[in-house]
Amino acid sequence: MSISIYNCFSWIGYHYVHYFLEKGIEVNGIDKIDSEKKENLHMLVGRNSSFRLIPPNSIPKDLVALVIGGTELPIYADRIIQIRTREMKKKLSNAIVINAPILFGEWMEMTEEDIKVGNRNVRFHSREFQSDAIYIKDFVKATAPLFHSSNKPSELSVFSKKVFLNEAVKLENSIYIRDNIPIEENVRKVLAHYRRYKDLYEYDRN
């Protein structure tokens, strides 16, 4: 099996690439390498024989295509899964849309105190972050089964388990992720990575 990942070197896309490669799945990556960070992320996965960086004019047909945000490029896949980020402008035709909560993780736009969420800055210690945020690796692991599932809802929403503690109020077509590791521990891990590779992180306060 192989999967096409559009915007594969966005910080979210990179984590999906890494996850599927670790599972032995071939990944066709589609992205423009136009920053030092993207060059670095390409180096991290480019030596893996199961990864191919695909030119826009040579996009293959795959069973599944994952699109982070949006794309103007053609998509040749039986199933399209689109991660709705804050920058997503429109839904792709025939795509299964996954509405993401606040996500945090390695390589995202951040500082020591906050993360970039769309056009906003969300502080690690804010009530919003503590109640809603999900670590990217937990998000990827929870959504990955959708790539193989025969169930095809048009839209899914992902929530932190902290949002709904009452089993009776769970919404249809929703995924609830429990923090198996305290959020503070994952924040410490991400901050340690940020401090180590700070020069490769990007952040724009405007």
Feature names for model-found ranges:
Residues K91-V140, A144:
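NAD(P)-dependent short-chain dehydrogenase/reductase
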Residues I134-N206:
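C-terminal substrate-binding subdomain of Rossmann-fold SDR/epimerase-dehydratase oxidoreductases
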